[in-house]
Amino acid sequence: MEKNEPTQSKYDAALAKYNTQLDDAEIAAQAARIIAEKVPANNTPEVKKFLFNCIDLTTLKSEDSDESVMKFTQKVNKFDEEFPDLKNVAAICVYPNFAEVVKDTLEVEDVKIACVSAGFPSSQTFIEVKVAETAMALMEGADEIDIVISVGKFLAGDYEGMCEEIQELKATCKEHHMKVILETGALKTVSNIKKASILSMYSGADFIKTSTGKQQPAATPEAALVMCQAIKEYHELTGIKVGFKPAGGINCVNDAPVSYTHLRAHETTLHL
């Protein structure tokens, strides 16, 4: 009697279409080579002005309050007066309970309201809580939602559990952009970063993002390289173009052109 072969899950089948067996040392060498050869050409005032306009200006502190978030938002309102030669930031990013404060205070057009949600930064709570928090953030005025993958589920090989959460949260977001944070510092290997990138895009991410900024290492050149490669390959295979957002570890103005260089090399849409 023949034994039935185990059925491959649709998530394993999705991963099988890509090379996810990457070597950490090779990726590190490739990232270093790209930085040495191409970053100097992108380290220009024009590029830095473009990158500034991609920033999500963020306050995610335990001591945030209505008053502090109002003052934070006023900085964006006054930006054009103080820096007339620069375009404003892309978004203000806050905890979901401050979405309405930003909405009521923000006076400038073309600056979005982004909220972290779904148990940020650990993603360790019930899916019902994640969905409710996300829905409430949108109801209070959020234009974009940032969530974190269930890293524990991913590392345990529970791709179905991780992906179904992302899919349910994207269904809640509907037409609103949803950025999916991989928390690359917790994934340890570039192979895991590649797999998490593909699974997140497969599950409906509009952008994939390196990290919460709460854990180190964060937006490393190696993580940026692998994520941008994954985005390019996913686009070539599906026709769906997903954006990229580096976060955490970008500590000064000269760090940003590194991520921009990987973006340009892989024709990727950027959010900072």
What positions do the PLM features span?
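Conserved small/polar residues in nucleotide/adenosyl-binding loops
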Residues: T261-T268
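Active-site mouth loops of central-metabolism enzymes
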Residues: L57-S65, V116-V129, L155, I181-N192
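Glycine-rich, proline-tolerant flexible connector loops at the mouths of alpha/beta enzymes
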Residues: L60-E63, E82-C93, I147-G161, T212-A219
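Active-site cofactor/substrate anionic-group-binding motifs, chiefly glycine-
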Residues: K87-E140
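Active-site-adjacent beta->alpha loops and helix N-cap segments on the catalytic face
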Residues: P96-D110, T125, G152-L169, T189-N192, ...
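Charged, compositionally biased N-terminal leader segments and the immediate start
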Residues: E2-L51
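Hydrophobic faces of well-ordered beta-strands that scaffold small-molecule active sites
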Residues: N53-I55, A90-V94, I113-V116, I145-I147, ...
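Conserved, mostly hydrophobic/aromatic
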Residues: D56, V102, A137, V180, ...
